[in-house]
Amino acid sequence: YLDSTYLKTAAQAGLSVDENILVTKGFIQEAIEERFKLIMIRPDMVCLAKKMITEANSTLQIGTVIDFPQGESSLEEKLAEAIQAIQDGADDLDFVCNYEAFKNGNVDLVKEEILTCTQLGLANKKVVKWIIEIAALNDKQIIQLSSLIKNVIVSNFEQELFPKVFVKSSTGFYKTENNLPNGATIPAIT
């Protein structure tokens, strides 16, 4: 199976809003025609994707990012964005974990975020992914945050739901010092 991702805003792509919508439509159409499993798009494009997929009678799934790319919004803001994405037709919710709060020792906030957002996603039969942004963390923090997510899931959900929850390494948007790889590239992980 292939997934495909387009997460650029119009400004990031150097396009007008209308031009970026056309690019997104082309991206969605290609995924439909090539029978990809899932597309990953920004939340404001989920309705457009759902409409195109439904009209094409396609099985293409829609993933979207929540609190992207920094992950520093409040729990209430994360939940509101996720609820809207679910209502708009998203199948996969990729939450950016508040890794800065974790680094600053606010583990309880991160636990609550992981538990509450995962509950929302799983209750709505969605795949839930937690992006931890490894370029912003040292090796010890990567292990600790990944373990924290695992422990929250294992302690609070039935085993049959475990395959619906993932940890992802990177948004691909993290700005590193000296232009070093940000975790979303082969050189960063080899």
Model-inferred region functions:
Residues Y1-E34, L38, D44-T190:
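Alpha/beta enzyme core
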